Amino acid sequence: MSKISKIKAREVLDSRGNPTIQVEVWTEAGGHGSAIVPSGASTGTREALELRDGGTVYESNWFGGKGVQTAVDNVNNKIAVLLKGHCVLNQRKLDNMMLQLDKTENKSALGANAILGVSLAIAKAAADELKIPLYRYLGGTNAHQLPVPMLNVINGGEHASNTLDFQEFMIMPLGAKTFKQALQVANKIFHTLAKLLKKAGHGTQVGDEGGFAPNLKSHEEALDFLVKAIEEAGFRPATEGENAVAIAIDAAASELYHDGIYTFKKLKKAIEEKRQGFEPTRVQFTTEEMIQYFGHLFHTYPIISVEDGLAESDWKGFVRFTQKFGKTHQIVGDDLTVTNAKILAEAIEKKAINSILIKLNQIGTVSETLDTIELAHKAGYTTVISHRSGESEDTTIADLAVAVNAGQIKTGSLSRTDRIAKYNRLLAIEEAIQSTAQYKGEKVFFNIKK
């Protein structure tokens, strides 16, 4: 039995310069694993709690209350004591021991960031001890599918200080034959988009996830730029066929929702400030009008997927949205389901979505994440493994995407090392598994008819 000999946590910084937690685990046989926990900007209300130092003894003089020293202390003084001497290969048992120590529904006692850091580092230490890569340890011999990347080339919402209310405008290289080719396609489109934005007088500053963050007058203008960039790069803006590149949107609509009304707040502010080029236009929508708005976008642009098109509390709206468009489009739940198997079960029963976004830190352990993915796949749902806006050099999600044959991954644009690190890891995995590697492209959408 390979026993854990040491667990050590420390405070480090994420891609926004905010504190996060890094955990290292060592075993008696020489295994070692290290993990850095990500952090989100637009978060679901039912996510597991990310423990920060606000309200603790650290608040007044440590990162303005955003520090994670409390979570670090919980790892070093509580979790480490509990888990030392236990077999590193028993992931589920160790995860359950931490959950029993915490004793809360949302992991607020120890902090989901503390628990997840340990859970991830344990998995990596186990893989290291067995001398196998993480994707093979988590997925076994069946781990072979490289994910179609959703590349967030235009940022908005909480991820950028611009005028776009929708959070992410993404491209999906569906016509590529391999993951490496998909990145080559994306690279060409990304740099073509930069030239088009410059030519139109826009800056090419980037948002939290590495995509451009121009001050555009509407979501349609952002989509027009994407279509033009795809075409000028030599590809087809389409959801299927040769050289097809489709578009995906993350509306992050919970950020826009209040008292039953969706408001494009950034656009509204730009109009009220009478900024140049911003003409009066509609900025408020009911649920039914939002669904109709997406219908207009679907009819006009090659959009294949929408994430959080409605607010997390608008369950009836999600059901209507999926009834209307779920047979032809991927309707992804993120804030709605927060990688929680219990909530996903409710969504499956109500037929509220047909796809789920998977974020490790929304639920807080490797075991619970795998349970949610398994439930989604059994229900015939697609799964999208996702980063957070606050990231690091940690590449765990790349291995996870291959381990569970998720088929899709969201990990930002083709800039910022914290995003590129995941793509580079996937390139290495594709090379390592060579002839058994699969990239499904448009076939990844097995549960819809385009």
Swiss-Prot record:
Active site, per annotation: 209 (proton donor), 359 (proton acceptor)
Binding site residues for Mg(2+): 250, 307, 334
Cofactor note text: Binds a second Mg(2+) ion via substrate during catalysis.
Keywords, alphabetical: Cell adhesion, Cytoplasm, Glycolysis, Lyase, Magnesium, Metal-binding, Secreted, Virulence
Pathway: Carbohydrate degradation; glycolysis; pyruvate from D-glyceraldehyde 3-phosphate: step 4/5
Record-listed E.C. numbers: 4.2.1.11
Record field: catalytic activity: (2R)-2-phosphoglycerate = phosphoenolpyruvate + H2O
Protein name: Enolase
Gene encoding the protein: eno
